[in-house]
């Protein structure tokens, strides 16, 4: 789908469709008023008849409006004018894209980007429109024998901006939005792939292909079980020893900074391509969704793709910690004591708390990069879902400025996160009689104690942990990976470069 920006008046547009907003109750937006004026009150007359109230998401498609050059006008309800916020704006864009796609409008000029959204500028409105449009049209049908496609799908979208001086900002917003949307799609495609296809070797192959596609700035190396054993990554190895699929850790290095020696930002993604729980086996209900336990790695993959697409002037290392937690006679057991790469020992009380065992060795491994910051991303705890539901990503950090930076990026991107505490009183729950620590700390504060566990392996750098157990995928009729938090981390990186669209 093609996106562009322009600045022009609605009456001069020759297009299959013009999209304008209507506020509640039956109030035309300024652009809709212009169209109403040149059509001699045609639109306002329809509203007075009760054809459209203006509630969020309501639509009315008009054909051959008098004196209007475009074939059709789509009126879209935007709610109350003073209450139009970012969430409602995205809902309006989503409904617009679906309506255009379903009604055969192959191209459209959209004036919704001229609406006032509280606290948001033109760059944000255009970028979010692009990202939302791509999200709305996303399908995962690679494995279906019969693919259903619209007869006349939407192919071109033009976003109008109020003034010509905002064209540059709008064009930058499209560029950023397309790159972020591509990263989100890549993460969703990986997450939605079934575990008989997407195993650790598949993750590694995708990492290699990513490096091959972006030339000299990017390299990938894959660390297998033999090298892990030589390094002493015994916690990581233990998790995968019950699986027929070899554990593989893919390390993607992107060097985009003009200073080749600049310290990198390191992203570490949990990549459990299937998590049966091991000996502490999960219940059968919804176990199929444990293919999504690699969405942390999928996120890192998507963010790396975004950074390469935009040639961000940063050095970034992305780690996809691929593994599979299965049950057989070789599987690790509750009661085992593991010596991690850091030298610290861990008593395994529950084999279904395996993600932190993989991550702890990965977090120690990345010390060699002398990172500026390290951010790990993981579908780590059901406790985080209980605490924050499916709307907010959980965040813990050992560095207040980094935590504030991430929360700010999350708010900017509309991919929200909430910081959880990281205190000594929670660390006490991890005490073990037989090792330096246990791998679980009981039910109370489970998302926090998981973060406390990881913090013990991140003492040598500024670190943050994102628990995406509640936000990485949806269940039910809309089942599928969400691609979160690619948008948040992309915004974080854009902010680091100064290319964040602030005006």
Curated annotation (Swiss-Prot):
Residues the record lists as binding Mn(2+) 1: 275, 352, 354
Keywords: Aminopeptidase, Cytoplasm, Hydrolase, Manganese, Metal-binding, Protease
Main location: cytoplasm
Annotated positions binding Mn(2+) 2: 270, 275, 293, 354
GO biological process: proteolysis
Highest taxon above the source species: Bacteria
Subcellular compartments: Cytoplasm
EC number of this enzyme: 3.4.11.1, 3.4.11.10
Cofactor detail note: Binds 2 manganese ions per subunit.
Residues annotated as the enzyme's active site: 282, 356
CDD domains xref list: Peptidase_M17
Cofactors demanded by this protein: Mn(2+)
GO molecular function per UniProt: manganese ion binding; metalloaminopeptidase activity
GO cellular component: cytoplasm
Described purpose of this protein according to its UniProt entry: Presumably involved in the processing and regular turnover of intracellular proteins. Catalyzes the removal of unsubstituted N-terminal amino acids from various peptides.
NCBIfam families, alphabetized: PRK00913.1-1, PRK00913.1-4
Annotated PANTHER family: CYTOSOL AMINOPEPTIDASE, LEUCINE AMINOPEPTIDASE-RELATED
HAMAP family: Cytosol_peptidase_M17 (MF_00181)
Family to which the UniProt record says this protein belongs: Belongs to the peptidase M17 family.
Name under which the protein is recorded: Probable cytosol aminopeptidase
Natural source organism: Sodalis glossinidius (strain morsitans)
């Amino acid at each position: 789908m093609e996106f562009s920006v322009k600045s022009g008046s609605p009456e001069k547009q020759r297009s299959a469709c013009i999209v304008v907003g209507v506020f509640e109750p039956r109030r035309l937006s300024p652009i809709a008023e212009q169209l109403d004026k040149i059509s001699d009150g045609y639109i306002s007359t329809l509203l007075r008849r009760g054809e459209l109230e203006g509630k969020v998401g309501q639509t009315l498609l008009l054909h051959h409006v008098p004196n209007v050059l475009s074939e059709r006008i789509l009126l879209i309800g935007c709610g109350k004018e003073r209450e139009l916020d970012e969430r409602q704006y995205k809902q309006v864009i989503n409904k617009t894209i679906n309506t255009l796609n379903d009604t055969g409008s192959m191209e459209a000029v959209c004036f919704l980007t001229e609406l006032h959204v509280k606290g948001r500028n033109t760059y944000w409105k255009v970028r979010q429109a692009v990202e939302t449009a791509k999200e709305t049209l996303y399908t995962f049908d690679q494995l279906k024998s019969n693919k259903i496609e619209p007869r006349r799908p939407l192919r071109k979208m033009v976003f109008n901006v109020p003034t010509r001086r905002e064209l540059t900002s709008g064009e930058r917003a499209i560029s950023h939005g397309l790159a972020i949307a591509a990263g989100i799609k890549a993460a969703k495609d990986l997450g939605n792939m079934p575990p008989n296809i997407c195993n650790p070797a598949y993750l590694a192959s995708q990492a290699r292909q990513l490096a091959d596609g972006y030339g000299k700035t990017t390299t990938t190396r894959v660390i297998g079980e033999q090298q892990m054993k030589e390094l002493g990554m015994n916690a990581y190895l233990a998790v995968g020893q019950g699986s027929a699929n070899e554990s593989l850790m893919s390390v993607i290095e992107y060097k985009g900074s003009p200073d080749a020696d600049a310290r990198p930002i390191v992203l570490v993604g949990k990549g459990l391509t299937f998590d049966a729980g091991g000996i502490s086996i999960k219940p059968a209900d919804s176990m199929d969704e444990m293919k999504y336990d690699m969405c942390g790695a999928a996120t890192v993959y998507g963010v790396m793709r975004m950074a390469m697409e935009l040639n961000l002037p940063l050095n970034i290392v992305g780690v996809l910690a691929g593994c599979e937690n299965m049950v057989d006679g070789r599987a690790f057991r509750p009661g085992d004591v593991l010596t991690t790469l850091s030298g610290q020992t861990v008593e395994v009380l529950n084999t279904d708390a395996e993600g932190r065992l993989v991550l702890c060795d990965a977090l120690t491994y990345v010390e060699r990069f002398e990172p500026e910051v390290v951010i790990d991303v993981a579908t780590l705890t059901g406790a985080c879902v209980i605490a924050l539901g499916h709307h907010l990503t959980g965040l813990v950090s050992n560095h207040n400025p980094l935590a504030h930076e991430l929360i700010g990026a999350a708010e900017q991107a509309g991919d929200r996160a909430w910081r959880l505490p990281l205190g000594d009183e929670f660390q006490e729950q991890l005490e073990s009689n037989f090792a330096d620590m246990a791998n679980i700390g009981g039910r109370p504060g489970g998302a926090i104690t998981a973060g406390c566990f990881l913090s013990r392996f991140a003492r040598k750098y500024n670190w943050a942990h994102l628990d995406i157990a509640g936000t990485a995928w949806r269940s039910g009729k809309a089942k599928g990976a969400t691609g979160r938090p690619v948008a948040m981390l992309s915004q974080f990186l854009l902010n680091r470069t100064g290319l964040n669209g602030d005006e």
